[in-house]
């Protein structure tokens, strides 16, 4: 089992975690339906960049 050699300070722990924050999702409005969707993702009705890509 791994055991640390020395105790890491609160500062070192915070520095390591400084890149762990989540950013908010980027949203766009679909040109054809006006639906709000995540950027670079297909909308719920199957459109991507104004073209139908998924047939249900």
UniProtKB/Swiss-Prot annotation:
Residues 21-31 have a biased composition (Polar residues). SUPFAM superfamilies: Zn-binding ribosomal proteins (SSF57829). It comes from the Bacteria. Residues 7-16 have a biased composition (Basic residues). This is Large ribosomal subunit protein bL32. One of its GO terms (biological process) is translation. Residues 1-37 are annotated as: Disordered. GO terms for molecular function: structural constituent of ribosome. The keyword Protease does not apply. Belongs to the bacterial ribosomal protein bL32 family. Pfam families: Ribosomal_L32p. Keywords: Ribonucleoprotein, Ribosomal protein.
